[in-house]
Swiss-Prot record:
InterPro entries: Ribosomal_bL27 (IPR001684), Ribosomal_bL27_CS (IPR018261)
GO BP term, pick one: translation
Maturation-removed propeptide residues: 1-9
Name of this protein: Large ribosomal subunit protein bL27
The keyword Zinc belongs to this UniProt entry's keyword annotation: no
GO cellular component, one term: cytosolic large ribosomal subunit
PROSITE patterns registered for this protein in UniProt: RIBOSOMAL_L27 (PS00831)
Family, as annotated: Belongs to the bacterial ribosomal protein bL27 family.
PANTHER family to which the protein is assigned, alphabetical: LARGE RIBOSOMAL SUBUNIT PROTEIN BL27M, RIBOSOMAL PROTEIN L27
Keyword annotations of the record: Ribonucleoprotein, Ribosomal protein
Gene3D superfamilies: 2.40.50.100
Organism: Clostridium botulinum (strain Alaska E43 / Type E3)
Length: 99
């Protein structure tokens, strides 16, 4: 009687895969114009999620909670109450700066 012992081997080695190795792209949030900085109308002051900093005088809020300047002027960050912050833009007399 003929008995055959037949063993089949894989022709490619099995390679384990990692469950890591991916990450989301950074959103580049944060303050873009600092306190005392001159900004033009439309310039972004803060990119944020939620209203960590609230819009103050002459500052608008976009649909993604981005704060932007409505007029040309100087940015001022202010504290309102105990735990609230706001960003405002105040107009600057250009002739006073030139002198």
């Amino acid at each position: 009687m003929l008995i055959m012992n037949l063993q089949l081997f894989a022709h490619k080695k099995g390679v384990g895969s990692s469950k890591n190795g991916r990450d989301s792209e950074s959103k580049r949030l944060g303050v873009k114009s600092t306190d005392g900085e001159f900004v033009l109308a439309g310039n972004i002051i803060v990119r944020q999620r939620g209203t960590k900093i609230h819009p103050g005088n002459n500052v608008g809020r976009g649909k993604d909670d981005t704060l932007f300047a409505k007029i040309d002027g100087v940015v001022k960050f202010e504290r309102v109450g105990k735990d609230k912050k706001k960003a405002s833009v105040y107009p600057v007399d250009v002739e006073a700066i030139a002198e």
